[in-house]
Design a protein with these regions (language model features):
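A short, N-terminal "cap"/entry segment at the start of jelly-roll beta-barrel domains
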Residues: 2-4, 28-76, 117-119, 126, ...
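Bacterial Sec-dependent N-terminal signal peptides
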Residues: 2-14
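Bacterial N-terminal signal peptides
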Residues: 11-25
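Short histidine-centered beta-strand/loop micro-motifs
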Residues: 88-93, 111, 118, 137-139
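Glycine- and acidic-residue-biased ligand/ion/polar-headgroup-sensing regions
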Residues: 95-114
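Ligand-binding loop in jelly-roll beta-barrel domains
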Residues: 121, 130-156
Length: 166
């Protein structure tokens, strides 16, 4: 079997296992959601926040090109670390579905679809998909670590030169 096929197969196995773990949630807990009485009928404007101290490490990438006529897309798994005072910048998921598993810590999400901040804790999972914007912050004194799996075009992949070391 060619080496590149073995690597892809191994990467695919890891990705499938991790996506399954995220979907099931290691503890079966879904992350806190916007309280029903705080869900907005129409998105409101939220602050545009810049990246503050986020460390990213791409764990594996699966090239989905040609699979079920999906186009030129990749399934990417990353570990993101939000240091104390850190911010994951304002971003959207209109065309980038994502699953997140919180490994360590507590993050606060600010969403254009919710009237109040949403708290996410270790052991919970969350889905990110739809026409809204959000940003996350770490207001604690320890790192927040999460695993994110998303579907992206090649130009959304992280620059390996800026990837966090193992």
């Amino acid at each position: 079997m060619p080496t590149h096929f073995r690597v892809m197969t191994s990467g695919l196995r890891i990705a499938v296992l991790c996506v399954g773990a995220v979907l099931l949630g290691a503890t079966g807990a879904q992350a806190d959601e916007c309280p029903k009485d705080k869900v907005l009928a129409h998105n409101h404007d939220i602050e545009w926040k810049d990246d503050v101290g986020i460390r990213r490490k791409t764990l594996t990438i699966v090239d989905l090109t040609g699979w079920r006529e999906i186009g030129d897309l990749r399934m990417r798994m990353r570990r993101l670390t939000i240091p104390p005072g850190g911010i994951i910048p304002t971003h959207e998921h209109t065309d980038r579905p994502s699953l997140v598993y919180f490994v360590k810590g507590e993050a606060i999400e600010h969403s254009s679809a919710c009237d109040v901040p949403i708290v996410h804790r270790a052991g919970e999972s969350d889905t990110e998909w739809g026409p809204y914007r959000h940003w996350w912050e770490n207001k604690t004194d320890s790192d927040v670590v999460l695993i994110g799996v998303d579907i992206v075009p090649p130009d959304f992949l992280d620059d390996p030169k800026t990837d966090e070391p193992n």
